[in-house]
Each structure stands twice: as C-alpha cells, then as structure tokens.
Amino acid sequence: MRVTKIATAKPFVGAPKINLAAIVGAAPNKPFLLRIPVTGERPITCRASGLPKGVTLDGQILSGVFSEAGELDVTLTVENAKGRCERTVRFEIGEGKLLPTPLLGFTTWNAFGSDVTQKDVTQTAKRLVELGITEYGYGYVNTDSGWQGVYGGAHDAVMPNAKFPDMKAMTDAIHALGLRAGIYSTPMLTAWGCPKEFSSIPGCTVGEPDPRFTDTNGGIGMIHKEANNVAQWTDWGFDYLKYDWRPTDTVNAELMRAELAKSSREFAYCVTVDALPQYHAYWSRFVNSYRCNWDALGYWSNLLLVYESYFRFMEYNCKGHFFDLDMLDTGTCRCAAVKNELTEDEMILAYTMRALLNSPIQISSSLEKLDDFELSLYCNDEIIAINQDTAFSLSLPILRGRGVDVFEKRLADGSYAYAYFCIGDETVETVAELEGTATVRDVWAKEDLAETATLSLTLAPHTARVVRCTSRIKSVIQK
C-alpha cells in the first residue's frame, strides 16, 4: 500500500492555468513550434500579445520564425467558462538558447524497446494530448533506437526500416499537435537497440574502425557521415537528437554538434551514455543534456545506481545544460510486457529525483495501460514547476544521513524547495529548523502543512517528500 500522498491529476477540470516556464528559448531564422500547456475545463481560448512578425498563435500552438536575436516579453491569456489566466513569458532568441529549462517529453525505449513502430510513435503523441499530459509541459516525442535500416536515399544516410514507412509523415503528425519530434543515433559503427529482425543497425560512421577510439560495438568508423544524416533528419523534420555511445568523448560529440548547428532546423542535443565529468566544461556549454549512468530499468537497486550518479555532476548543472538521470522507469513497459518492479512509493521517488535534481523528464511507459496513479505521477504542476524554475539554482544536499538525503533548491520567487529521499530500509525522522516562521507546503499532496519555524517529517523506507517553504532551512538533523 502506498504511503506517500499525491494529488489527483485533473487536466481538464476547473479554471485555466498556463503551465509554461517563465523563459522560452529559440534560435533566430529557424522554424519555431511550441504548444502552450494549459490545464482547465474545455473549451478554452488563447491569446498572445507582443509576438513579433512571423510568429503566430493558432489555438494553443505558437509557430513561425523569429527573424532577429534578442529578448522579448509575450503575454499569454487563456480563458474558459471557469475563469481567466494571464502569464508573461520571456522569449530569449539566439544561437544555443533552446531549452533553457530541462526537457519534458516522451521517449520510446522503455515503452516499446526496439520493437517500436511509426504507428506506436504517432499514437503515443495523440494519446499524450488526449490524456492531458501535454498540458503540463511535455513537448517532445522522441523515437529511440529501433527505427534504423540501411544506408541509402538522397543524402546517403541511414534510412528507416519497414516499421517506419514515412518519417516525414510521422513528424508532420507530431508537429500538427504542437509537439516536437526526436530521433536516435550513434557515432559507433553499430547502434545499440537492434530490432530482432536484423543482425545489426548502422550509426553515423562507416569504414574501418578509428584506432583513436574504443571498439565498443565495432568502434567508431574512419568515414564520418554526420553531415549526411543531419541533412536527412532535417528533411524529415526532426527537432531533437539523442546521440548514444561509450565512452562519450567530446571529439565525436563536437563533430555532430557542429553539423546540427548548420541545419536549417533547430535541434535539441542529448549525449549519452558515458559523458564523464572530466569533460563537464564541454557538456555545460554545448549540449542540452548529458548522461553518465546506467539505463533506468525499473527495479530498486538500479534506481539507486542512477540516483548516485547525480553526485558527481550536481555542481555542473546550469541554464540550458543539465545532467540527465535517464528516462523514467515507471509504469508498464511493453518491451518487458509487464509492469516494472518498483512500488508506487518508489515510482514517486524516481520521479522526484528527476524533477528536483534538475534532470530532463521523459515518460517512457505504455500509455494505453495508464492508470489514475500514473497520470497523477506525471501531471503534478507544482512538482514540474520546481523542475522548470528559472532561477536555475543548483539542487544541493544539506543532509546526507543514515539512509536519508535532503536537497535544497532556491526558487525564482524567493522560496525554497526541499526534497527528502529516504533511500534506506528503515523509517527515518527528521527535524529542520527554519530561519523564521514560514508557510510549508507538501508539494506532492498540494496541501499547506503549517505556519512553523520547525519542520518535523517522518519518512517511510523508499519514499520521497517534497516541501516548499517561504523561509530557508538553517539546519536539519536525523533523529
């Protein structure tokens, strides 16, 4: 039985609320697309004032081209029968400005594995909208490995296999919903995630292995096809690349980044799976997110390994560049055909660590089996707002105790978010002294706890709590 109380998500009930970060980034002179996330009763009307020439709002979807670099404030107004909401958003237009806050979206790997099909991707995109998940800011639908066939086509690039008959039609369908589309590749000669009907699938290099790099999956080829593949992804209409190899070196990362920058489309760029901290200066400047951890596999000991990976990178997170704790390992995964081994409390902890530790959040479960708990797990606007907060503060531990860790994150409104992780196997009691009397809110439950200068919390094993305080904690102890 679940211990942690969480509020029930009701994306299409009540007055409207805009769930968009206070800062949005985009490149000049490249196509821009954004679905304005709005919860509340339907129908709704949306208006925007302050948009430049070339960018328009159609329903909830902003699209067009920003012709000049710079900053501008756009006021968004939404109304329904229950009320009205207005929010001013800062648009920062320039090279490298995309995704100032962590990416929110869906990725196919845990949900479908290498069996993924074009139909799976397009149906998932529609389901994200129908369920209301997109109204909390999830804006990317990313296809992981399993789409690849052989080299060919107009650009001599990797072509899709028969499971993906029309990549352009797929991205068009995703874009029509106001969402962005992602793709997967690797600099290795052979990609991970090969579908069972193939013996291997190619990456972005060919030829003999380059002796400068390790021989993982055949190594990295001497002949580089990054430009070919980026040209093909551009023609298809993709907006995001997951680039996956081990060890994740900056030479190959930069070769791909440079080609993405030349594209007529703007690409978010994620590198995995062994982006070592010794290269943090590069990751923190040139990639939107980077991983150096195990794949999230949906059981407790694996979750702890992913969690522990954060501590080597926690001081390097910065605006636009975030350490990635991998896709969510929650819900039902079709590739395993069963629900994962995590309890509901452990799933809450898994989500909390991504949200509060400034990681991208990518859902990766089979949405046709989504239940009320899972929807509420993914769709807590107050938890997501902490992840998307534009103070861009680090989330750092103020207590590493016996089976319990407490993290602090300063927020843009001057309040503080605290995440408590009980990772041990025993119940833990904590007492925190605040700098003054404060309003304390249980963020998962969406309930105010008290006006207090002392916060006492009891945490059951394998649980997480998130509180938001109007005053800072000056000390916290484990009893």
What are these regions (language model features)?
Residues 15-43:
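Solvent-exposed, low-complexity, repeat-rich "mucin-like" stalks and linkers
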